[in-house]
Amino acid sequence: MARLNINPTRMEMTRLKKLLKTATRGHKLLKDKLDELMKQFLEIVRENKRLREEAENALDTAYKNFIIARAVMSQEYLGSALMMPKQSVSVDVSTRNIMSVDVPVFDFKTENNQSDIYPYGLAFTSGELDSAMEAFSDAMQPLLRLAESEKSAQLLAQEIEKTRRRVNALENVMIPNYIETIKYIAMKLEENERASTTRLMKVKDMVLKKALEEKKKNDLVV
């Protein structure tokens, strides 16, 4: 806490009181924003955990089935089966606003029938490969949601840190400095007022003393 280097005048004190009022109001608004950001961030983190588990389970199932398929199928047939993908996908990217933070929204679309996920005929492939392809397809949506969630959490964390720095600056530096300076100016003004009153009383005493002396002289002459 440090006092601002300004002239201790009533005008400056009035100006500082206005700044203090603005800073206090800004601190409350930023504190409310920080609380809401933290709430949104924690909700995204919880959703992130759920999506990660969902994606990991789907991928785990896909990998296990793929390993079995690779064991029971020849490498030639397996490579041929996966060489030409039959279904095409696209991802549209947009944004949504959370407390003045633009976070991404990923929209996953398939251009063919969702059920048409097998890029091969069924004559020379195993059921495990079908299960693996289905599991990989099922994992796409939670993986995309997971990427969206993690990026949103990252952006909110950055905004939280920036807002927290501003709250701390107001709370620990600016507002205390304004208060300290206002107290200092009030003290100096009070000192000046006391000094001015003392001077006036001294002048009054001198005037009275001089008047009494003049009266005594006049009385002696009479």
UniProtKB/Swiss-Prot annotation:
One Pfam family matching this protein: ATP-synt_D
Main function: Produces ATP from ADP in the presence of a proton gradient across the membrane.
GO molecular function, one term: proton-transporting ATPase activity, rotational mechanism
Signal sequence range: none
UniProt entry tagged with the keyword Translocase: no
Protein known as: V-type ATP synthase subunit D
UniProtKB keywords: ATP synthesis, Hydrogen ion transport, Ion transport, Transport
NCBIfam families in the record: PRK00373.1-2 (NF001543), V_ATPase_subD (TIGR00309)
Family classification: Belongs to the V-ATPase D subunit family.
GO-annotated biological processes: proton motive force-driven plasma membrane ATP synthesis
